């Protein structure tokens, strides 16, 4: 599964406003932006993002993941 497919999967499954995926199957970096993260701890946010990817991780199609997650409001603040 390539980065574009991962992006579309996360957007669809998690109803994200935006997802940016970089890297390769050895290590992917995910920046996820969506209202699903409102009032959710960082640990729970990571669990939410891992859920649709878990089979790919188990099957070793993805080896390492770096996750950054934001609500739309948090994302806007990072851009200033």
From Swiss-Prot:
One Pfam entry name: BolA
Superkingdom field: Bacteria
Any coiled-coil regions, as ranges: none
Protein family according to the UniProt entry: Belongs to the BolA/IbaG family.
Protein name: Uncharacterized protein BU385
